A protein has these predicted regions:
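Short, Lys/Arg-enriched N-terminal segment that forms or immediately precedes the first helix
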Residues: 2-17
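Short helix-coil-helix linker/hinge
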Residues: 17-24
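Residues in the helix-turn-helix
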Residues: 39, 50
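Short alpha-helical "recognition helix" segments of helix-turn-helix
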Residues: 40-44
Length: 66
Protein backbone atom coordinates (compact mmCIF):
# COMPACT_ATOMS: atom_id res chain seq x y z
CA UNK A 1 0.00 0.00 0.00
CA UNK A 2 1.42 3.33 -1.05
CA UNK A 3 -0.19 6.41 0.44
CA UNK A 4 0.49 8.46 -2.68
CA UNK A 5 -1.60 6.02 -4.75
CA UNK A 6 -4.81 7.05 -2.97
CA UNK A 7 -7.04 9.62 -4.70
CA UNK A 8 -7.99 12.84 -2.91
CA UNK A 9 -11.37 11.57 -1.71
CA UNK A 10 -9.69 8.50 -0.19
CA UNK A 11 -7.02 10.66 1.47
CA UNK A 12 -9.71 12.87 3.01
CA UNK A 13 -11.60 9.80 4.24
CA UNK A 14 -8.46 8.39 5.87
CA UNK A 15 -7.60 11.74 7.48
CA UNK A 16 -11.08 11.86 9.00
CA UNK A 17 -11.36 8.23 10.09
CA UNK A 18 -7.90 7.12 11.19
CA UNK A 19 -7.55 9.41 14.21
CA UNK A 20 -3.94 10.23 13.36
CA UNK A 21 -1.79 12.04 15.91
CA UNK A 22 -0.26 15.33 14.74
CA UNK A 23 3.01 13.57 13.88
CA UNK A 24 1.23 10.77 12.04
CA UNK A 25 -0.87 13.25 10.08
CA UNK A 26 2.20 15.21 9.06
CA UNK A 27 3.85 11.97 7.89
CA UNK A 28 0.67 10.93 6.04
CA UNK A 29 0.38 14.28 4.25
CA UNK A 30 4.03 14.29 3.20
CA UNK A 31 3.86 10.70 1.92
CA UNK A 32 0.74 11.63 -0.04
CA UNK A 33 2.94 14.20 -1.80
CA UNK A 34 5.51 11.51 -2.75
CA UNK A 35 8.15 12.50 -0.17
CA UNK A 36 10.47 9.65 0.83
CA UNK A 37 11.05 8.66 4.44
CA UNK A 38 14.52 10.23 4.25
CA UNK A 39 13.09 13.49 2.96
CA UNK A 40 10.42 13.45 5.67
CA UNK A 41 13.04 12.91 8.38
CA UNK A 42 14.92 15.98 7.12
CA UNK A 43 11.78 18.12 6.84
CA UNK A 44 10.46 17.35 10.32
CA UNK A 45 13.94 17.08 11.87
CA UNK A 46 13.66 13.57 13.30
CA UNK A 47 15.64 10.40 12.71
CA UNK A 48 14.83 7.95 9.94
CA UNK A 49 14.09 5.40 12.66
CA UNK A 50 11.38 7.69 14.08
CA UNK A 51 9.92 8.10 10.59
CA UNK A 52 9.85 4.31 10.23
CA UNK A 53 7.90 4.06 13.48
CA UNK A 54 5.45 6.68 12.23
CA UNK A 55 5.08 4.77 8.96
CA UNK A 56 4.20 1.56 10.78
CA UNK A 57 1.66 3.32 13.00
CA UNK A 58 0.03 5.07 10.04
CA UNK A 59 -0.17 1.87 7.99
CA UNK A 60 -1.66 -0.02 10.94
CA UNK A 61 -4.39 2.60 11.36
CA UNK A 62 -5.14 2.63 7.63
CA UNK A 63 -5.46 -1.17 7.57
CA UNK A 64 -7.89 -1.06 10.50
CA UNK A 65 -10.11 1.47 8.73
CA UNK A 66 -10.03 -0.29 5.37
Amino acid sequence: MKIYDFVNSELEFLRAECNFSDEELEYFNLRAKHYSNLQISLIVNVSEAKVSVLAKRVKTKIKKVL
